[in-house]
Amino acid sequence: MKRIPFVLLALLLSGVACSDDSEGPKKERESDPVTLTLSDPNATEETKALYSNLWAIQSKGFMFGHHDDLMYGRTWYGTEGGSDTKAVCGDYPAVYSFDFAEHIDDRHASDPDAQALRLRCCREAYDRGMVLASCIHINNPLTGGDSWDNSSNRVAAEILTEGSATNRTFKEWLDRLADIAHNLRGSDGKLIPVIFRPFHEHTQTWSWWGASCTTTEEFV
């Protein structure tokens, strides 16, 4: 199975010494250095910068995002530069979210035009300086149902059973995801860092990876 170069690395942010000479005795306050650790020692410089910047701005506020913002809106579809957020707020969102599921599971060849559009929008978002985040509402690799097919509690177990049909299917899907990650580049030619958030809402019961279908050990 190919290695997915999605985000996470190690960075050191230096502490900041603060002093106030205007009132009373000189006071000096130093913050301890913070070590940020990513799981991938080969993370790209863009990935490192993304993680560092997200850490640095957390005390200043939050970032507004909109799913598929550049791909379609209330009255348009696929218009380059389109954004309902921009139409309402005057600017593009800081975070662009999208779903890669249809690129990797058994729907991967079903709508090449929509897939090409989604990848184009990802590149456009990166070029605009947005933070990219991807979820994957992939189909059920055991039953062939959709993400919400929670009819079996054996899906995760079969995925984790080396050599099973479900295990092989799931690895094939991950290989397709790896291909995207290795080839998704901005206009600067650099790989685009993506915050990958699979299997979200896993404590709920409505998906095949949810609490009604998996054990804590299987999920971890």
Task: Describe each PLM feature range.
Residues 14-17:
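C-terminal motif of bacterial Sec signal peptides marking the signal peptidase cleavage site
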Residues 19-21:
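Bacterial signal peptide processing site
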Residues 103-219:
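Substrate-binding cleft of extracellular glycoside hydrolase catalytic domains
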Residues 1, 24-27, 195:
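Intrinsically disordered, low-complexity sequence elements enriched in Ser/Thr/Gly/Pro
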